């Protein structure tokens, strides 16, 4: 061992002590999760929910677009029809043990019924408990888009209402008037 190696080793130890001393009073980087909640970005994709309209009806019209676009095939539903002609899912099931939280189902939904919320606490001991039914997913409010109503904007007529009669709905466009 040479004198040069001893001096380098000594200054390395001194430098380490100064680095520890400089950071001893700084804020710790580690979060103690259950006690301290972590910051989630506003667009964080977490748990999937189903929302309702302002009038309390389900927004989902069972169009099956969410199930088709899902890359892991974790969404299943069956369409049924009410007496007024409105479609709704007879059952709606999401298997969260397969879901990768990609958000494609939210993008594909024309009614804004499916929304991803910033909630990631979905762990469970049994895999079958991660299969959520419609009653588990349906919330009482409109979610992120409170003023959106698919039937008011889509031009789909319900029994007892004509297309274009609602306040926020535009009259149907006659395509032949647009031609030169």
Curated annotation (Swiss-Prot):
NDH-1 shuttles electrons from NADH, via FMN and iron-sulfur (Fe-S) centers, to quinones in the respiratory chain. The immediate electron acceptor for the enzyme in this species is believed to be ubiquinone. Couples the redox reaction to proton translocation (for every two electrons transferred, four hydrogen ions are translocated across the cytoplasmic membrane), and thus conserves the redox energy in a proton gradient. It comes from the Bacteria. This is NADH-quinone oxidoreductase subunit I. It is found in: Cell membrane. It catalyses: a quinone + NADH + 5 H(+)(in) = a quinol + NAD(+) + 4 H(+)(out). The keyword Transmembrane helix does not apply. It comes from Buchnera aphidicola subsp. Acyrthosiphon pisum (strain APS) (Acyrthosiphon pisum symbiotic bacterium). The keyword Zinc-finger does not apply. [4Fe-4S] cluster 1 binds at residues 60, 63, 66, 109.
């Amino acid at each position: 061992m040479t004198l040069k190696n001893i001096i380098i080793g000594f200054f390395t130890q001194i430098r380490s002590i100064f680095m520890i001393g400089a950071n001893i009073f700084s804020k710790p980087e580690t979060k103690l999760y259950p006690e301290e909640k972590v910051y989630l970005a506003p667009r964080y994709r977490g748990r999937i929910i189903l929302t309702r309209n302002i009038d309390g009806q389900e927004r989902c019209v069972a169009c099956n677009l969410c199930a088709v676009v899902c890359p892991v095939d974790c969404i299943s539903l069956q369409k049924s029809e009410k007496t007024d002609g409105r479609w709704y899912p007879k059952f709606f099931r999401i298997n969260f043990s397969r879901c990768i939280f990609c958000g494609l189902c939210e993008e594909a939904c024309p009614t804004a019924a499916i929304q991803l919320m910033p909630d990631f606490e979905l762990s469970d001991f049994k895999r079958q408990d991660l299969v959520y039914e419609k009653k588990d997913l349906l919330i009482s409010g409109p979610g992120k888009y409170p003023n959106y109503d698919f039937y008011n904007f889509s031009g789909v007529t319900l029994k007892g209402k004509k297309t274009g009669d609602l306040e926020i709905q535009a009259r149907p466009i006659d395509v032949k008037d647009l031609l030169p």
